[in-house]
From Swiss-Prot:
The keyword Magnesium does not apply. The keyword Magnesium does not apply. Catalyzes the reversible phosphorylation of UMP to UDP. It is found in: Cytoplasm. This is Uridylate kinase.
Length: 239
């Protein structure tokens, strides 16, 4: 089973992580594989909450840069995260993992409202909690939502699953000389403008001394490895 190093974690997935190789929408095989892996993490005894982006369906920032009202675009992005959250709930429950979706925007027919104490009770009972609709406010990314929810539920760490195996000095797919950083401080991330999380999310983690681990979600077994304390990817923390 493995023994969890982190008792309570918040896993942040990009919307693209659900799209698989097609690059958009939701790929059933990909989401089923992620659900099966999360089931293994739950079996270790670790408590896991999820925040999923919406970029596989709609990108608010991209739409606003082309003339759409930023607040409207961001609300559309929040709805995209709810589509992903419901899809992930379905995939998790199909593999036998009790899952609750909590939305920052009221939509009582499809999800619980976000209530911090209720979310913590769900986690204590061994359920997965998926936080949808970001923070419920425009101008805030799902990275910031992940940082905020992680603080609120008392998570030990944020795990950011991406398509690369850590943080690099440049895009490793475009620049063969890019260097991978095994460890970084929050200030290094902010000063170098590294694509870990946006500055608001990183600053929030820094102020509350919450570690961030960036790792490759596309390799099966990596979520469990990180939760059990194996050093893969890049860890971002204080001095």
């Amino acid at each position: 089973m493995g023994t969890p190093y982190y008792g309570r974690v918040l896993l942040k997935l990009s919307g693209e992580a659900l799209a698989g190789d097609q690059g958009y929408g939701i790929d059933p095989r990909t989401i089923t594989a992620i659900a099966a892996e999360i089931k293994e993490v739950v079996a270790t005894g670790s408590q896991l909450a999820l925040v999923i982006g919406g970029g596989n369906i709609f990108r608010g920032l991209a739409a606003s840069s082309k003339g759409m009202d930023r607040a409207s675009a961001d609300y559309m992005g929040m709805l995209a995260t709810m589509i992903n959250s419901l899809a992930m709930q379905d995939a998790l429950e199909k593999v036998g993992v009790d899952t609750r979706v909590q939305s920052a925007i009221a939509m009582q027919e499809v999800a619980e409202p976000y209530i911090r104490r209720r979310a913590i009770r769900h986690l204590e009972k061994g359920r997965i909690v998926i936080f949808g609709a970001g923070t419920g406010n425009p101008y805030f990314t799902t990275d910031t939502a992940a940082s905020l929810r992680a603080m609120e539920i008392g998570a030990d760490v944020i795990l950011k699953g991406t398509k690369v195996d850590g943080v690099y000095s440049a895009d490793p797919k475009k620049d063969p000389t890019a260097i991978k950083y095994p460890r970084l401080t929050y200030l290094e991330v902010l000063k170098k403008g590294l694509q870990v999380m946006d500055a608001t999310a990183t600053s929030l983690c820094m102020d509350n001394n919450l570690p961030i681990i960036v790792f490759d979600i596309t390799t099966y077994g990596n979520i469990k490895k990180v939760v059990c304390g194996e050093e893969i990817g890049t860890i971002v923390k204080g001095e």
